[in-house]
């Protein structure tokens, strides 16, 4: 069953969302991230996705105080990404009790670190692949490179990582629906579980992802749709738990 994972993006200690990774388009949803995290757990989340946006952009861990408070309040696993560019930083977060650390920029710039960390900490390391039109972006999406996302998936499928998070930048924060072709292409290549991220704006969007479970998608990160009230977390969890094939067919027809 695909796991629904609510997201909290941290910027200057607050819970925010960006549109397509643009730091000039920031919407603040809650200035108390630990309170927001506890709400997601109370509503049924089994895992929380955290992103340190300051860290992603600058490489500096500017939101550790908020991260510690969230960890103290929750009993569910936490995965965190954003600015984790050294072995020491990754291990500090694991020592803090974070279940999984997500490495993006460093995975592209120094892939050997992924191999070392995943050997030492099996099932604790996740690679984040953020791409636009199939090309990977790094450093908080401020730097575009000519590397294909498919090549990265092939490489990291040979390591002991726990999963790969695939984010299509062109859909992230837009509520316009996921890039199913992009997700399907990567899922068919990968030999490790994939977690989809970006574009979810309705229950129909969730339903459209469910058939990809057979291709290796086992998680779905949702952010802005939950904060905007497009649907609530309990509803999303119920839909995945009680998925009906006819509902999926109808959802795909609606999107055709």
UniProtKB/Swiss-Prot annotation:
The GO terms describing molecular function are:
1-(5-phosphoribosyl)-5-[(5-phosphoribosylamino)methylideneamino]imidazole-4-carboxamide isomerase activity
Subcellular location per UniProt equals: Cytoplasm
**Matching SUPFAM superfamilies:** Ribulose-phoshate binding barrel (SSF51366)
Pfam families registered for this protein in UniProt: His_biosynth
Give the UniProt entry's GO cellular component terms: cytoplasm
Q: Which reaction does it catalyse?
A: 1-(5-phospho-beta-D-ribosyl)-5-[(5-phospho-beta-D-ribosylamino)methylideneamino]imidazole-4-carboxamide = 5-[(5-phospho-1-deoxy-D-ribulos-1-ylimino)methylamino]-1-(5-phospho-beta-D-ribosyl)imidazole-4-carboxamide
Q: Which Gene3D superfamilies match?
A: Aldolase class I
Q: Which UniProt keywords apply?
A: Amino-acid biosynthesis, Cytoplasm, Histidine biosynthesis, Isomerase
Q: Which residues form the active site?
A: 9 (proton acceptor), 130 (proton donor)
**Which pathway does it take part in?**
Amino-acid biosynthesis; L-histidine biosynthesis; L-histidine from 5-phospho-alpha-D-ribose 1-diphosphate: step 4/9
UniProt record, GO biological process = L-histidine biosynthetic process; L-tryptophan biosynthetic process
Chief localization class? cytoplasm
EC code(s) of this entry: 5.3.1.16
Q: Which family does it belong to?
A: Belongs to the HisA/HisF family.
- NCBIfam families of this UniProt entry? 1-(5-phosphoribosyl)-5-[(5-phosphoribosylamino)methylideneamino]imidazole-4-carboxamide isomerase, PRK13585.1
What name does UniProt use for this protein? 1-(5-phosphoribosyl)-5-[(5-phosphoribosylamino)methylideneamino] imidazole-4-carboxamide isomerase
Q: What organism, scientifically named, is this protein from?
A: Prochlorococcus marinus (strain SARG / CCMP1375 / SS120)
- What phylogenetic lineage does the species belong to? Bacteria, Bacillati, Cyanobacteriota, Cyanophyceae, Synechococcales
Q: Which gene encodes it?
A: hisA
């Amino acid at each position: 069953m695909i796991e629904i994972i609510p997201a909290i993006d941290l910027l200057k200690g607050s819970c925010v969302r960006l549109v397509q990774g643009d730091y000039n388009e920031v919407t603040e949803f809650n200035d108390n991230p630990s309170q927001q995290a506890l709400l997601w757990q109370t509503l049924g989340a089994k895992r929380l996705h955290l992103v340190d946006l300051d860290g992603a952009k600058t490489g500096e861990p500017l939101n550790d105080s908020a991260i510690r408070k969230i960890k103290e309040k929750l009993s569910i696993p936490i995965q965190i990404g954003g600015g984790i560019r050294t072995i020491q930083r990754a291990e500090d977060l694991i020592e803090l009790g974070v279940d999984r650390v997500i490495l993006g920029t460093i995975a592209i710039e120094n892939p050997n670190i992924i191999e070392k960390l995943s050997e030492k900490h099996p099932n604790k390391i996740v690679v984040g692949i953020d791409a636009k039109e199939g090309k990977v972006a790094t450093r908080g999406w401020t730097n575009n490179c000519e590397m294909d996302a498919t090549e990265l998936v092939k490489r990291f499928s040979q390591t002991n990582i726990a999963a790969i998070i695939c984010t299509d930048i062109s859909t992230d924060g837009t509520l316009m629906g996921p890039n199913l072709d992009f997700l399907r292409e990567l899922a068919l290549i990968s030999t490790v579980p994939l977690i989809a991220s970006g574009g979810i704006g309705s229950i129909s969007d969730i339903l459209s992802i469910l058939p990809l479970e057979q291709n290796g998608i086992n998680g779905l990160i949702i952010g802005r749709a939950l904060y905007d009230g497009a649907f609530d977390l309990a509803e999303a969890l119920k839909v995945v738990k009680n998925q009906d094939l006819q509902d999926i067919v109808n959802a795909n027809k609606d999107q055709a």
